[in-house]
Amino acid sequence: MNRHPASTLAEGRHRYTLRVYYEDTDAGGVVYHASYLRYAERARTEALRDLGIPHAALTAQYGLMFVVRRIKVDYLRPARLDESLTIVTEPLVVGGASLVLRQEVQGSAGACAVLEVQLACVQPGGDKPARLPPSYRATLAKMRDARVGCDAIVRHDAGVRRDTGIGAAP
């Protein structure tokens, strides 16, 4: 698996750690509000990759992709230049054509922001929802139910399948 070194998956939660760079901040050294959206996007991408269901495989094998349908952000406290942040991602709802994730950006003094993101599955260029492949839905549901880790997945990205009982073959 091509896992990011700052990425872990355990007990139904994915953790992705990054550092705040100057480019992420305003003139006062505080993380600019839109930077949290980028952080969450990176963390979601790495979570899917660590589950063995990366964006590229969903498109290549099924002709589908995720788009953000709705996002809600609660900003709780500022993060600052050079601070180490961990983004914790966990699925709340796994539907037939969408999923809802909770993402918490954690800093040295606690939670900085909490995001609730609804992703819709669509065909590229399409504006109508498409059903998630059953094995993807099953993998995400197992994560939601806190029963999946990096070693208990169905690989979709490299043509390798480890039979774990988490869904059908791709």
Label the model's feature ranges.
Residues 2-50:
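Catalytic strand-loop segment that frames the active site of acyl-thioester-processing enzymes
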Residues 29, 89, 127:
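Hydrophobic pocket/interface hotspot
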Residues 2-8, 13-16, 49, 75, ...:
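HotDog/MaoC-like acyl-thioester-processing domains
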Residues 50-57:
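Short, surface-exposed acidic-centric catalytic microdomains
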Residues 60-91:
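Helix-adjacent hinge/juxtasegments
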Residues 36-39, 67, 118, 139:
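Residue-level recognition of specific faces of alpha-helices
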